[in-house]
UniProtKB/Swiss-Prot annotation:
It comes from Mycobacterium tuberculosis (strain ATCC 25618 / H37Rv). It is found in: Cell membrane. This is Uncharacterized protein Rv1303. It is a multi-pass membrane protein. The keyword Zinc does not apply. One of its GO terms (cellular component) is plasma membrane. Its main location: membrane. The keyword Transmembrane helix applies. Keywords: Cell membrane, Membrane, Transmembrane, Transmembrane helix. It comes from the Bacteria. InterPro entries: ATP_synth_I. Was identified as a high-confidence drug target. To M.leprae ML1138. The chain crosses the membrane at residues 22-42, 43-63, 89-109, 110-130.
């Protein structure tokens, strides 16, 4: 059975999106990619894959910044968010494709880095949210009456009402 949206626990983005942790994961993955690519004689592919990971992180940071600025307005518009997203994605995609074209075939690592970052972002965002949701459903929920006392009749007499 699914939980209705109004009953779902609120999960703040700060719980899910941790850019510093993502940065260190990206650096580690870029180092591994460079090591593996270097073993096969294509060190630049690993470097470009790392660049793609960093471009993906830049995109995620820009998403957070634009979402914060747009939702801070009194009447945020979906149109401004959509326009901002489309222009940002277009710029990063064009930049990635230009790098891939100029430095081909090794530059294609940028495109793979961007794609891999999206998978990484979903994984590192979804896992903490799922963990938070799981712990929220395991904790007992206290109910309060109109006089501010917790629900249940344990330890109370009938005259307490």
């Amino acid at each position: 059975m699914t939980t209705p949206a109004q009953d779902a626990p609120l999960v703040f983005p700060s719980v899910a999106f941790r850019p510093v942790r993502l940065f260190f994961i990206n650096v580690g993955l870029a180092a591994v990619a460079m090591l593996v690519a270097g073993v096969f004689g294509h060190l630049t592919v690993g470097m470009f894959l790392g660049l793609g990971l960093l471009l993906g992180l830049l995109n995620a940071l820009l998403v957070r910044r634009s979402a914060e600025s747009i939702t801070a307005k009194e009447h945020p518009l979906k149109r401004s968010m959509a326009l901002n997203s489309a222009s940002r994605l277009a710029i990063i995609t064009i930049l990635g494709l230009i790098i891939a074209y100029i430095f081909r075939p090794a530059g294609l690592g940028v495109v793979f880095g961007l794609a891999f970052f999206q998978v990484l972002l979903v994984a590192t965002t979804a896992l903490p949210v799922l963990k938070k949701l799981r712990t929220a459903t395991e904790e007992p929920v206290a109910t309060y009456s109109s006089n501010g006392q917790t629900g249940g009749s344990e330890g109370r007499s009938a005259s307490d009402d």
